[in-house]
A protein has these predicted regions:
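Bacterial N-terminal signal peptides
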Residues: 8-18
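Positively charged n-region of N-terminal signal peptides that target proteins for export
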Residues: 1-5
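Scaffold/interface architecture of coatomer-like assemblies
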Residues: 23-307
């Protein structure tokens, strides 16, 4: 991993242009990084956030900010996987909006479409900046319903790239329900495993609620699925999109918000005390100014070179 020291004398304008967002400073006993989304409250152009405006606590203890910079050219690499639930066979009417979203991503964004099958994420093609090609790989899922959290864990453990400088983000289209266990459990072990795997892999997971059951299904089951999806999004620094427990008329407002989030993200690198083996810890981030900040609730802390 590249290691740069943020010198206090460097002008903010130079910092914003030249620093790799995930660059690390001098390590303490442990280090980590995260993707942070910074928006204004009324959709204005987001302000520049300087390193001195940011503070963090990891595991309840003050952490040293060793890197903070926006994802702007030339350091704006984004790898995005659109995951589609194997039960979403009623999704056909939304395909035009999904294709448009894929085709209108920023030119440098690499995207792939994955389908949940038998506890795995089956990729329709490689991560590619050819958005028209990726859009052409969109089709209705064919396999039986599977646990979405199994599939997410598989994706996190087998991310289709080794570019450590790129953002890794996921748009997960699902109702969040395990077909083998439809009872809501806030400590669902498969969800917790998916969160751990995603945090360790540095994934930001956005969830788009899409109800696969015809006729609406059971509202208690739907509420439970949404709660699990919400927990997943909050833990990884993503966002959760839904309209009640029914399917949205249009995905367009969601896709517009996603585009805005992709364009307003920062790379955070930090040093924190690590008294044992690499671990998942809680993150509390504070950013000065009138901004809305979305940060992961959990981060992976590890020894230098032990990612």
């Amino acid at each position: 991993m590249k290691r740069n020291r943020f010198a206090a004398s460097i002008a903010a304008a130079v910092l914003l242009v030249t620093v790799n967002p995930f660059a690390q400073g001098e390590p303490a006993s442990g280090q980590g990084r995260a993707i942070i989304t910074v928006l204004t409250k009324h959709n204005e152009v987001s302000p520049v956030v300087r390193p001195q405006d940011v503070s963090a606590k990891v595991d309840g203890k003050e952490a040293e900010i060793t890197g903070w910079a926006p994802f702007k050219a030339p350091n704006d690499k984004l790898e995005l996987v659109l995951m589609i639930d194997s039960g979403a066979r009623n999704l056909g009417r939304q395909f035009e909006e999904i294709r448009s979203f894929v085709q209108n991503l920023n030119p440098g964004t690499k995207i792939a479409i994955g389908y949940m099958e038998n506890g795995r994420t089956v990729m329709a093609g490689p991560l590619s900046a050819d958005h028209n090609r990726a859009a052409s790989e969109l089709h209705l899922p064919a396999g039986p319903r599977t646990n979405p959290y199994f599939s997410l864990s598989d994706l996190a453990q087998n991310w289709p790239s080794h570019d450590s400088d790129a953002r890794r983000e996921v748009v997960l289209l699902s109702d969040g329900v395990d077909p083998e266990n439809r009872r809501f459990d806030p400590e669902d072990p498969y969800l917790q495993a998916a969160i751990t795997d995603s945090v360790r892999a540095g994934l930001v997971v956005y969830t788009l609620y899409w109800r696969s059951a015809p006729g609406g299904g059971n509202s208690l089951v739907a509420d439970g699925g949404q709660s699990l999806l919400s927990e997943l999004g909050q833990a990884t620094g993503g966002y959760n999109y839904w309209e009640g427990t029914g399917n949205p008329v249009s995905f367009q407002p969601y896709f517009s918000d996603l585009m805005r989030r992709f364009d307003n993200q920062y790379g955070l690198a930090f040093a924190a005390k690590l008294n044992r083996k690499p671990t998942i810890e809680g993150l509390k981030l504070k950013v000065e100014g009138l901004v809305q900040v979305t940060a992961p609730q959990q981060v992976y802390v590890h020894l230098p070179g032990a990612e």
